Design a protein with these regions (language model features):
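Internal catalytic-core helix/loop-beta-alpha segment
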Residues: 123-143
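Residue-level signature of outer-membrane beta-barrel architecture
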Residues: 52, 86, 113-115, 144-146, ...
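Membrane-embedded beta-strand positions in outer-membrane beta-barrel channels/transporters
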Residues: 47, 79-81, 108-110, 137-141, ...
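Transmembrane beta-strand segments that form the barrel wall of outer-membrane beta-barrel proteins
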Residues: 30-40, 58-70, 82, 88-102, ...
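Bacterial Sec-dependent N-terminal signal peptides
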Residues: 1-33, 214
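Outer-membrane beta-barrel "beta-signal"
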Residues: 202-214
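Transmembrane beta-barrel outer-membrane domains
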Residues: 39-45, 73-77, 102-106, 131-137, ...
């Protein structure tokens, strides 16, 4: 989808930056902020997750992603979602969220199963998203951070989301991160794969990433 108003994109990016700073100053230690920046051969991208723990069972999350080409705005990707997550027994989490993504506003309800270990995180989700019609959405996150030395850890992170309706595969992506981590900073190789069955051709982006856990 082509973004016709460049000013809107600039304003959105500025707002995203301010939102991240604001949440840290207001919520304090009960809030985590994790920005991830990528410089690729086709485009540059920014993602952040802000999580604020309301109670032992309730968590409020804000996820923002944008991906912009260097020369044109033809294939800009944007995704903003606010989610309320409720912790259920036996590693299950119920989520309800709303936001905006190409090509417009949406709402989601989905169930996750989470496995968390010292150096491994696995999350599988399934639910439904409404955006000009209902789709079945499935997601997968795998993250492995083995200890390499006293100060360094390896980083392997794979995330994928797929949406299908009764007729076709409507939207999907796969993001790969492979690198090293020291304390709160991770960096390395990044690869993003995007599919838009209803509009654009499939997109690929290869480059470097930096991720910070605040």
């Amino acid at each position: 989808m082509k973004i016709n108003n460049h000013r809107q994109m600039v304003f959105a990016r500025f707002f995203i930056f301010l939102f991240g700073l604001f949440t840290l100053s207001v919520f304090g230690q009960s809030t985590t902020y994790t920005p991830d920046m990528m410089l690729g051969h086709r485009s540059y991208g920014y993602t952040h997750t802000v999580s604020h723990k309301l109670s032992d069972k309730l968590t409020l999350q804000n996820l923002v992603l944008f991906d912009a080409e260097y020369e044109e705005d033809t294939h800009n990707i944007f995704f903003i979602r606010n989610t309320l997550a409720y912790q259920l027994p036996k590693n299950f989490v119920l989520n309800a969220g709303f936001g905006v993504k190409n090509p417009g506003k949406f709402a989601s309800v989905y169930l996750q199963y989470q496995v968390k270990r010292k150096d491994f995180i696995g999350v599988y989700g399934i639910g439904t998203t409404y955006q000009k019609g209902f789709t079945l959405e499935q997601s997968l996150l795998l993250e492995y951070t083995p200890k390499l030395t006293q100060e360094w850890e390896g980083v392997f992170r794979f995330s994928a989301v797929g949406n299908v309706n009764r007729h076709e595969y409507t939207r999907g992506f796969q993001h790969l991160r492979l690198g090293v981590k020291r304390e709160k900073v991770a960096l390395g190789f990044a690869a993003n794969f995007e599919q838009f069955a209803m509009s654009w051709n499939h997109l690929e982006n290869y480059g470097l990433f930096v991720k910070i856990n605040v």
